[in-house]
């Protein structure tokens, strides 16, 4: 089971496992916690479980083409947004509205290779207000198969 790779976090793992087994996946999850506790890693594992060619939507095999592409971050239905520095000399990182709009365009299409499109927004708190407002609509009314 791919969730075996996630250290600790027993309660969140049980919640995710139960949702996958019941086939009742909400359109969004918020992974919150201290830095380096495995939030992004867990999101990747959920993405693999949702798109695995062998065991989806309950688990991932970590061997099929879909799992391997997600692991390498090259799956065409996986989108990962990371905040970028607002300027070369700045320490502040930000997610801008242009990045969110580009993601929204990509999510409008049906999955190309997998079962479902997955967007992982790392450090979502770094969105500027315009980006956050724009993304709110996607959260409230997600496109099909996302």
Regions found by a protein language model. Give the residues of each.
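Sensor-1/coupling segment of RecA-like P-loop NTPase cores
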Residues: 127, 142-146
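Clamp-loader machinery-focused feature within the broader ASCE/P-loop NTPase space
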Residues: 2-130, 137
């Amino acid at each position: 089971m791919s969730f075996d790779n996630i250290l600790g976090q027993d309660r969140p793992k049980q919640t995710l496992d139960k949702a996958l087994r019941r086939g009742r996946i909400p359109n969004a999850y918020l992974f919150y916690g201290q830095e380096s506790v495995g939030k992004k890693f867990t999101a990747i594992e959920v993405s693999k479980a949702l798109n695995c060619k062998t065991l989806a939507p309950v688990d991932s095999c970590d061997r099929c083409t879909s799992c391997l592409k997600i692991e390498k971050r090259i799956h065409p239905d996986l989108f990962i947004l990371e905040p970028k520095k607002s300027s070369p000399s700045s320490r502040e990182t930000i997610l801008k509205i242009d990045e969110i709009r580009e993601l929204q365009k990509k999510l409008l299409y049906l999955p190309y290779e997998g079962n479902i499109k997955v967007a992982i927004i790392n450090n979502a708190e770094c969105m500027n207000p315009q980006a956050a407002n724009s993304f709110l609509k996607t959260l409230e009314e997600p496109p099909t198969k996302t």
